[in-house]
């Protein structure tokens, strides 16, 4: 996870002096374009600050203790005194206040994020950040999870195979957890989203050396909705986990069969022994013990109708795997491929590069962003170089905005992955 953008450290962002760089895109630099770019830039700064606040707090396992539910559920007195506003204030009020204070007191050190202070006084900036945080929070309905077909059908009993264990974990009441982000047209840079339940919720997990490796939680469920929706015919999935995708795909009448490619024999053993027997349509399931990269090399186009890749655990460990595997699947025309949390890779690592490149070209100033790991920085630098090969012409604010849509960004990412293959 990135360093908090609003905290002073040696890794913070500055805007350098003017510099000359090879043009990336042909941008018409009229006032309308410049104004639209400035609006996008401030949306980015606000979003990155809010993303870091939410995700940093969740990483520390944020939860509200001794909650006064009578007060929380009491009649709302104004738009600023709602249930969600009270939750937001309890959970994030102090850290947002700290962030705003830091932005005003350490402007030089916190550039470019302190640009947010140019047009707003501290009170208004605090309100704006709190409103944005609140929009990123979701009170989850536990009944919707419990009514999920997988939860209704699959019951987990503790079991172990070498260092891999099948178990359950839980969320405490009012414990915040990261959820799968919803695209927001009004601010495409927002991806830090958190949910909570009012009740204790239990969910299945796979542990590796006593640490959670895989789980079926609300974020996982929502992250696969579109991929499950398009599953039909002969389906193949690379990565088994707890079998959520395989289960949901096998439940569809449109799915003739579901082939699972998994290289971990212990995960396969636990699944076959504990989970697969509970599948209503277990006869549709076929498991192949193999490495996904080795398997895809020999796979013929059209043997399967739908393919889904999910053999990484999160955005950090998955970035290289996604880019490498996506490039391997680009040759398929008949088999339709999708990739777990592809939009998250876009939001975390690629969309920020595009806005940075755009602003550097328009302002002719170098923008230095917070340090990330060397591996991620290498990918981002290669993506920045790749953008220089694009001949897009931007002549209106509308065209500028379209660059940052999910469709446009995913197209860029996939083209980048194919033209700049990653090494193992």
Give the positions of each predicted feature:
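A short acidic, amphipathic alpha-helical/loop segment
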Residues: 248-249, 298-300, 321-328
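Short, positively charged and aromatic/hydrophobic N-terminal segments
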Residues: 11-17, 21
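Short SAM/SAH-binding signature in class I
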Residues: 302-311
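N-terminal auxiliary segments of SAM/dcSAM-dependent transferases
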Residues: 26-195
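C-terminal substrate-binding/active-site "lid" region of AdoMet-derived donor-dependent transferases
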Residues: 313-416
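S-adenosyl-L-methionine
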Residues: 270-302
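SAM cofactor-binding core of SAM-dependent methyltransferases
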Residues: 217-229, 234-276, 290
